[in-house]
Amino acid sequence: MGIFSKPEVIILKESNSAKEYLELLEELLPKASEEIKSKIEKEIIIIKAGIAGENNILFELKNSNMDMYVLQDIYIETEDGRGAQIDFIVITEKITFFIECKNLVGNIDVDSKGNFVRTVTYGRKKYKEGIYSPITQNERHMEIVKESKLENRNLLAGMIVKKSFHSLNRSLVVLANPKTVLNDRYAKKEVKEKVIRADQLITTIKKIVAESRMPSLSKKEMKEFAESFLKKNQENRKNYIEKYEELTK
């Protein structure tokens, strides 16, 4: 790979459909009945937290001092209609990272079986609840991306994609809330490597890239690769439309 005169972070897509959804909710709020208002207000809090978390990650990426292409909020569907909403796709010279942003309130414990438990404190009381594994969620997204890449390819090209996919692509779950404490003392090594705090993101990316034995891409190849994801992106977000329709019922 040719050496860049200066490391360059290129944000190929920064727009976030969550912001558009937030605007819809804020517009709807004053017109809503009291019963619906409560649901909308809770949804607004959740969406604002998610946007703040993604902004934290975007800040880290923009200041990474690395050569990379960044795409935010990408939605990819397979031909049979299964979809994956990916918070960030980051293309570096050797590895592409699929980043799931979690701006969770409370502290997170991960046990030896990979179970995630959140503890939230209200006053003097502590409440614990199990949450769906963000690792499983992100890896399912990656499987959908892989299957979308296999579509319309011949047998040989498909075999190459299958063989190289997990060597070239990595899943990272980033806890974007700076107040969240992550307790992964009993978690397996592979879990610890996939769940990190936002302030560990760039160090983690640099370490994985440095340890990779994959050949380096040129800047032109990185751009073409990033643009291939952008071409697959669909702006019609079923998840937000369905949420909005549910709130307005």
Please give the residue ranges for each predicted region:
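Active-site beta-strand-loop-beta-strand hairpin of nuclease catalytic cores
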Residues: 90-118
